């Protein structure tokens, strides 16, 4: 199963579960709880809100020296990515260790081409990531940063961490 197919299937299962919870189909006593309860109110997507992507390069200082056969390093170049939508913010980062062959410049050039303002619904994860993948071949660090930030944003909107959305055990 491809990663995209898995994400699409997981999204449909999550959406279906949310419908059942919202109607009281599986979980009783949860529908209509105010914030502060165990299950947050679902976020309503719509209106004129648009996603906005921004990024900032920085040098990540490693807590411990990282060593491979040919060298050691105490820092790594990094680019932090933010996707903002209707007062919510998702974060991702592109880490570029030397052996990946990507640079801060190449990541920033790629991210400068990404225009998420054409999307009004961050839950269109597959459509958004297909668009991002189609911009250039390669640029995997930059694409991963957008992917991570988008998933973080959707988790923020749902009020849940992804391990819980996917039904995983936090331990």
Regions found by a protein language model. Give the residues of each.
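C-terminal segment of N-terminal export signals and the immediately downstream linker at the start
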Residues: 22-62
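Metal-dependent enolase-superfamily TIM-barrel catalytic cores that perform enediolate-based chemistry
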Residues: 164-171
């Amino acid at each position: 199963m491809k990663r995209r197919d898995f994400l699409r299937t997981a999204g449909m299962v999550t959406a279906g579960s949310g419908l059942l919870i919202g109607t009281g189909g599986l979980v009783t006593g949860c529908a209509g709880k105010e914030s502060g309860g165990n299950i947050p109110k679902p976020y309503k997507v719509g209106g004129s809100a648009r996603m906005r992507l921004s990024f900032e390069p920085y040098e990540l200082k490693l807590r411990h020296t990282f060593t491979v056969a040919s060298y050691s390093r105490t820092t790594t170049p990094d680019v932090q990515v933010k996707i903002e939508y209707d007062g919510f913010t998702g974060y991702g980062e592109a880490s570029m260790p030397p052996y990946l062959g990507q640079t801060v410049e190449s990541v920033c050039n790629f991210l400068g081409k990404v225009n998420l303002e054409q999307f009004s619904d961050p839950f269109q994860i597959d459509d958004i990531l297909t668009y991002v993948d189609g911009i250039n071949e390669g640029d995997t660090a930059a694409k991963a940063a957008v992917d991570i930030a988008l998933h973080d944003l959707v988790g923020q909107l749902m009020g849940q961490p992804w391990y819980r959305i996917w039904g995983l055990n936090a331990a």
